[in-house]
Amino acid sequence: MQDIYRHQDIESHVQRHWEQTQTFTVKEDPKKEKYYCLAMWPYPSGRLHMGHVRNYTITDVIARYQRMLGKNVLQPMGWDAFGLPAEGAAIKNKTSPIDWTKANIQYMKKQLQSLGFAYDWSRELTSCKPEYYRWEQWFFTQLYEKGLVYKKTSDVNWCPQDFTVLANEQVIDGRCWRCDSKVERKSIPQWFIKITAYADQLLDDLDELEHWPEQVKTMQRHWIGRSEGVEIRFPLDHDEKTDLTVYSTRPDTLMGVAFIAIAPDHFFSAEIAKNVPALATFIEECRHIKMAEAETATIEKKGIDTGFFALHPLTGKKIPIWVANFVLMEYGTGAVMGVPGHDQRDWEFATQYHLPIKAVILLEDGTEPDVQKKPLIEKGRLCHSGEFNGLSYQESCDRIIDKLVDLGTGQRKVNYRLRDWGVSRQRYWGAPIPMITLEDGRIIGTPEDQLPVILPEKTLIKDMINPLKADQDWAKTSVAGQLGIRETDTFDTFIESSWYYARYACPKYDQGMIEKAAANYWLPVDQYVGGIEHAIMHLLYFRFFHKLMRDQGLVDSKEPAKRLLCQGMVLADAFYYNAQNGERVWVSPTEVTVERDNKGQFLNAFDAQGRDLIHAGMSKMSKSKNNGIDPQAIVEKYGADTVRLFMMFASAPEMTLEWQESGLEGAYRFLKRLWRFVFDHVIQGPTQPLKKENLNSTQKNLRRNLHKTIAKVTDDIGRRQTFNTAIAAIMELMNQLYRAPTNTEQDRALIQEACISVIKMLYPFTPHISFILWQHLHQSPDETHPLNIDDSLWPVVDQNALIEDETLVVIQINGKMRAKITVPMNSTQQEVYESALQEPTVIKHLKGITPCHVIYVPNKLLNLVVNNE
């Protein structure tokens, strides 16, 4: 054994061993408890970033720990390989997306292997391979036959830069999630999957996901947006045979309606606009602004009075109809009743356009609110509401709805914010949608014997226009002798990531989408790890697809994953200087020299050219701020184990992690000191068996702390998933071991036990150094201690070692603490009293007076009551 830790010498050696022995390749074993641990698969962008490293390290720690519990652990890896960036890169580099993607996968796979992740590479998946996407094409045709897929022309979110449709979830603050371009509205034919048919299941089953973060479940509940209300029909004044239907969750405010607002794309808006040029212009302006429901609360409220009126369903009063930019056709009916006295948005609109504002709800104290100053949002008893005056919120809702139903002008209604999933993308680099339009106009799914519909992989892309649209030879096909035209749109790439976890159970199965026996063995995923930014896109589609596969008879479980961990972002210092044109030029932290005071506080920074830099603080690692850190360079400098240890120690997994190279250096020092400690122990030769019954008090205390640490680390990793506190506990134990005596054979035997346990506990975090140190600690392996730590089991707590022989008792005189003494556990009052009287501080404060009363709390406290008179 060499005396100095050199990560370069050991990590590649250990990784070769894992590759050659296929250590982490698994198969179904009904005799063993399974554990499926999965990180969200990456897009092969070409380089790993530190966010990837953190995600995959967390997952690997969990997987290795569960393996040491004796479970059959599956931890696969693959590539979410379709996507728009490949097209942009292909244009820039004058290559095909497939060649660019393959090269990226090859490089990133080497990066992952260099970090020592325990993947079963025999199950590797790549979503752009026909053998993968053929099954989602097949599944899509099955859903079409079941009526869960349909095509319609609809207004969609259109990215003018990427020339493609965006799902609602992919529009953030009115801009494309990918390129930040301002999103427009456009009417084009689209394919949809009926996720709304599963809205109740998706909502209700969230309650069964006990081990998912509440934040994710709350976000999904809000996105699904189930609400109970009433649909109310307001007849048009000029044509009482025609109604405007409004959906409301606040029927108690019906008597306060001041206006009806309809969406710019409502059918009535379009009808009126034919004869009102100003309205037509307004509608056109609104068409180019995609807005999520959440944004309606913050935008400037704009509208146009149509000059038409609706009739109040209970009073017959005429109510003006407005077209407003804050009403969304996608939610409810595309028409809302404006109650400015009791809704903030309606109040802002009414105030701007000088519409009447009426209070119909009383304050809690029974007085009438001044709704001219601000709306009363809270619920309460009704006023100015005729026969409903004085009723409570629930009473008024029930009575008003009942009356509307009796009059035939309303009905109870459950509504959802969730909209069907538009899966068409006008891009080339995606899985072709397997639909065909025949000569007779019928649309059918591609027959199974013609699947997969293969993308022409070597296509060179000259611009962002989809080349499939122009490839007439590819689009032409025939079915049963009838000519047809293929669909030239491709799938939203969220399709591929919605079922990959199930395919990992049977990656080479060629008789169907899923081999049910294998899927039912491995599923559901026991631990899923990924960022919370996926809460309402991937994680919702992921759950939806699982239910679709269940109903297709492919899997038996209700949900895809039992437990979800959302790791925090990785932050790094960001520095910039202002260029002559006023633009900020961001400088990589690796090129910055920082000066700090003796307390470590930032003083100033400058780059290699001596320019003074402005410190923008810690921010998410990103290309835009040039503050990303290349994992490969860090691994080469410090080693994979150091990077892994730092990543897990620097922060709790769900919290943000602040990247500091000083933290890496600290982790590196710890591993070097650990190596040297084991070296010094090993070179002294083999140890004798530990005689637990003959340990002295010092040895007992050390062994007790060892097994307390095992108990804590076990709980921290397995239940609490606070990996940073687990590492802190191991480090604290090592500090005790560094100071421990090594004079006797029993001292060394105890050090041997401690080293073995520490190496086992560190193995999930730092597998390479643990692998080598384990071999040096076991010159003669046996069944209890196998040759390779990969085959060893997690250390078991010796409950007998935790038994305390001694305890610390507080000594008080007249309630004031005067001393602390160590006595044998369960000592009697007399024994503790006699020991206390020997303490110098007790003698000093008693001043020769004999206590008149003694109070004893066994193993904790002795209070001597003294009469000082």
Curated annotation (Swiss-Prot):
It is found in: Cytoplasm. The keyword Cytoplasm applies. Gene3D superfamilies: 2.20.28.290, 3.10.20.590, HUPs (3.40.50.620), Isoleucyl-tRNA Synthetase, Domain 1 (1.10.730.10), Valyl/Leucyl/Isoleucyl-tRNA synthetase, editing domain (3.90.740.10). A motif ('HIGH' region) lies at residues 42-52. One of its GO terms (biological process) is leucyl-tRNA aminoacylation. It comes from Hamiltonella defensa subsp. Acyrthosiphon pisum (strain 5AT). PANTHER family: LEUCINE--TRNA LIGASE, MITOCHONDRIAL (PTHR43740:SF2), LEUCYL-TRNA SYNTHETASE (PTHR43740). Belongs to the class-I aminoacyl-tRNA synthetase family. One of its GO terms (molecular function) is ATP binding. The gene is leuS. A motif ('KMSKS' region) lies at residues 620-624. The keyword Isomerase does not apply. One of its GO terms (cellular component) is cytosol. ATP binds at K623. Keywords: Aminoacyl-tRNA synthetase, ATP-binding, Cytoplasm, Ligase, Nucleotide-binding, Protein biosynthesis. It catalyses: tRNA(Leu) + L-leucine + ATP = L-leucyl-tRNA(Leu) + AMP + diphosphate. The lineage of its organism: Bacteria, Pseudomonadati, Pseudomonadota, Gammaproteobacteria, Enterobacterales. This is Leucine--tRNA ligase. It holds the Pfam family tRNA-synt_1_2.
